[in-house]
């Protein structure tokens, strides 16, 4: 079951449609949690159903009710996160998954060593933060910038998830999902979509805004750049609470940002399912 589908389905179907009733029922319970089925798999179920197989019927009925989704635990109402500022300004995917290390992207463990362009000091600082906050999720942050600009979005998200995400399965090493990422100016659109693929959370912090004069005009500095004003502080080690029901971000019990855009009904489905692919395949299966 921890393979989430694919090649394992063939063997689960062999057991579910086999003659041993006890094993068949156990295999069926596992199949009811799976969504990544090929057409050949659903054809086998359909054929067995048409032949009057009761186990096949129970699996198909379960799929029709989307129990593979409805039986999953709900998203936590409150998620505690601790900020880790990856840098000031835009954070490129090349910082997260350098192009010079593209050859190792298929090896998650090896490629993970290149995070922050092999900056071991920064990697150790991240590990230390995690050790000091074992009960919290790390929120990788772009201060005064946008998170995830650049083209290496999938490998970048995979690498971030490897370091700060949740294990997809206790039996499958180096495959993590659901990272929490944030940026003063939000998340690059394609990077944000890819975060959704993993069931992660992307926050638009807006903790810095352009300063205005009494007439409402943007104040410009001597270099012709807008003067920024800090609305609330986000530094490494700061603890925040995401309330997924209220869709608000809190710091020290005070609301600092509305994060409704990160918790649309669709995105919350992705988070509950462990990624957008599970939702897409599940709806097709249903």
Task: Locate the predicted segments by residue.
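Conserved phosphate/anionic-ligand binding catalytic regions in large, soluble enzymes, centered on
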Residues: 89-93, 147-157, 267-281
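Conserved, function-defining core regions and hallmark residues within catalytic/recognition domains
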Residues: 57-137
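Short inter-helical turns and helix N-cap capping residues of alpha-solenoid HEAT/ARM repeat scaffolds
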Residues: 19-20, 52-53
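Feature captures the catalytic cores and cofactor-binding loops of soluble hydro-lyases/lyases
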Residues: 103-250, 255, 262
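Amphipathic alpha-helical scaffolding segments comprising HEAT/armadillo-like alpha-solenoid repeats
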Residues: 4-16, 36-48
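Core register positions within helices of long alpha-helical scaffolds
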Residues: 2, 29-33
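Intein/HINT protein-splicing elements and their conserved insertion hotspots or analogous self-processing inserts
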Residues: 54-61, 65-77, 241-286
């Amino acid at each position: 079951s921890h393979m989430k589908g694919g090649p394992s389905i063939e063997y689960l179907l062999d057991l579910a449609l086999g003659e041993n009733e006890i094993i068949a029922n156990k295999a069926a319970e596992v199949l009811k949690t799976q969504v990544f089925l090929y057409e050949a798999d659903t054809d086998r179920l359909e054929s067995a159903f048409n032949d009057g197989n009761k186990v096949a019927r129970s699996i198909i009925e379960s799929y029709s009710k989307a129990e593979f989704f409805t039986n999953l635990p709900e998203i936590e109402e409150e998620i505690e996160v601790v900020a880790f500022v990856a840098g000031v300004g835009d954070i490129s995917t090349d910082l997260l998954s350098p192009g010079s290390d593209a050859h190792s992207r298929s090896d998650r463990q090896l490629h993970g060593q290149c995070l922050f362009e092999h900056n071991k000091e920064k990697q150790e600082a991240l590990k230390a933060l995690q050790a000091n906050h074992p009960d919290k999720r790390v929120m990788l942050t772009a201060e005064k910038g946008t998170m995830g600009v650049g083209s290496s979005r999938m490998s970048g998200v995979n690498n971030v998830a490897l370091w700060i995400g949740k294990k997809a399965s206790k039996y499958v090493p180096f495959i993590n999902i659901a990272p929490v990422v944030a940026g003063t100016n939000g998340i690059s659109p394609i990077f944000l979509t890819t975060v959704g693929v993993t069931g992660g959370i992307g926050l638009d912090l807006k903790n810095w805004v352009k300063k205005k004069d009494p007439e409402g005009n943007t104040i410009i500095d001597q270099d012709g750049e807008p003067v920024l004003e800090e609305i609330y502080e986000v530094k490494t080690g700061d603890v925040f609470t995401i309330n997924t029901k209220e869709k608000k971000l809190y710091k020290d019990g005070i609301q600092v940002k509305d994060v409704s855009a990160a918790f649309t009904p669709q995105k919350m489905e992705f988070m509950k399912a462990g990624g957008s692919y599970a939702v897409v395949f599940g709806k097709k299966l249903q």
